[in-house]
Curated annotation (Swiss-Prot):
Region described as Disordered: spans on this chain: 78-107, 182-201
Stretches assigned to coiled coil: none
Protein name in UniProt: Thioredoxin-like fold domain-containing protein MRL7L, chloroplastic
Keywords assigned: Chloroplast, Nucleus, Plastid, Transit peptide
Transit peptide, residue positions per record: 1-48
Chief place where the protein resides: plastid
Origin superkingdom: Eukaryota
Function: Plays an essential role in early steps of chloroplast development. Involved in the regulation of plastid gene expression. Required for the proper function of the plastid transcriptional machinery and protein accumulation in thylakoid membranes. May function as molecular chaperone to ensure proper organization of the nucleoids in chloroplasts. Is a necessary component of phytochrome signaling for photosynthesis-associated plastid-encoded genes (PhAPGs) activation. Mediates the degradation of two repressors of chloroplast biogenesis, PIF1 and PIF3 in nucleus.
Subcellular location: Plastid, Chloroplast stroma; Nucleus
GO annotation, biological process: chloroplast organization; regulation of DNA-templated transcription
Skewed-composition ranges (Acidic residues): 82-93, 186-200
Phenotype seen when the gene is deleted: Seedling lethality due to deficiency in chloroplast development.
Length: 350
């Protein structure tokens, strides 16, 4: 059955010359969803409805983005205004302080300062000359010091002192000579002093050589110390480089032992110290190879050699046994008294 009237539906997209591929790309670019590209009535209606919904959603997104953009612009404008105000404050501060600096950098003021400085220099013309003289004097003194005390010394120098051996001086040169004399006051002086204040009395000094328990001995002094005086003598042979701690400790213990004898009211024996590094000939004559070592002598003979480190109490008992007739201490059990002769040492004269 054929109806008298026929209806045709034409797609507007196709009539306008658009291809399906261009329509698809356009819809994808605008984020529209197209479910069907058929150009029938049902497809066109469905496409129109979905596109309408997507257009509404895109409008909402545009409005939201617009609000965010407006808020961001407001915040940025506020920050910009704050920074502008801070810059203005800094400029004001610079202007306030710049006035003072400008006054200091004024060329007229600088000329005045230079003029006053020149006037002061002209009033005292000897200042620069004195400085030059001082520099010349300093240079002369420095050259003299370098000549007297050279920084580099040749070890093979024939004028090198034997007692120095790297030290540059010997302790005996400070303590061996009596530099202070004991002088008695006259009666007239005593009467005059008694009339005045008692606090202003002269102090009588005594040299350090009288109170030192151990005295340093050289090879040149050996013969006089041993053979001219036959009283008891103890010889401490030490080495400053070999076992330095033990050498120092042994010397301290020996000084304490001598102090014990003093406290007992007895005259302590003489005690000398020989430096093995300096007095090599004397050490070889004494046949000492282990340091430290103490040799007990009396009347030109060697009574005992102590090579171990003893305490002050043990050393005081050994001294009491050999020199004061005390009982034999336990530390000397099994030790036989030797009668070794004290050796002679030839002192070569340069």
């Amino acid at each position: 059955m054929i109806l008298p009237f026929s209806t045709q539906f034409t797609c507007p997209v196709q009539d306008n010359g658009f291809s399906p591929s261009s329509l698809l790309s356009h819809c994808k670019r605008d984020r529209f969803e197209v479910t069907s590209l058929r150009y029938d009535s049902f497809g066109s209606v469905k496409t129109a409805s979905s596109s309408k919904w997507n257009v509404m959603r895109s409008r909402r997104n545009v409005k939201a983005f617009g609000l965010v953009d407006k808020l961001g612009k407001k915040v940025w404008r506020k920050k910009e205004e704050d920074s502008d105000s801070e810059d203005e404050e800094d400029e004001v501060k610079e202007e306030t302080f710049g006035g003072k600096e400008a006054s200091l950098d004024d060329p007229v003021e600088r000329r005045e300062w230079r003029k006053t400085i020149r006037e002061v220099i002209d009033k005292h013309p000897d200042i620069e000359e004195d400085e030059e003289i001082d520099m010349v004097e300093k240079r002369r003194k420095m050259q003299k010091l370098l000549a007297d005390y050279p920084l580099v010394v040749n070890e093979e120098d024939p004028n090198w002192p034997e007692d120095a051996d790297g030290w540059g001086f010997s302790f005996n040169q400070f303590f061996n000579k009596i530099t202070i004399k004991n002088e008695k006051k006259e009666e007239e002086d005593d009467d005059e002093d008694s009339e005045g204040d008692d606090s202003e009395k002269e102090i009588v000094w005594q040299d350090d050589n009288y109170i030192r328990p151990i005295k340093d001995l050289t090879t040149a002094e050996w013969e006089e110390a041993v053979f001219k005086d036959i009283s008891p003598l103890m010889v401490l042979v030490h080495n400053r480089y070999k076992r330095p701690k033990e050498n120092e400790k042994f010397r301290e213990e020996l000084e304490k032992a001598i102090q014990v004898i003093w406290n007992c009211g007895l005259p302590s024996p003489r005690c000398v110290a020989v430096d093995a590094v300096v007095e090599t000939d004397l050490v070889s004559a004494l046949k000492v190879s282990v340091f430290p070592e103490i040799i007990f002598t009396k009347a030109g003979k060697i009574l005992y050699r102590e090579k171990g480190i003893r305490t002050a109490d043990e050393l005081s008992k050994i001294m009491a046994f050999f020199y004061y007739g005390a009982a034999k201490p336990p530390c000397l059990n099994g030790v036989v008294n030797s009668q070794e002769q004290i050796p002679l040492v030839d002192v070569s004269v340069n």
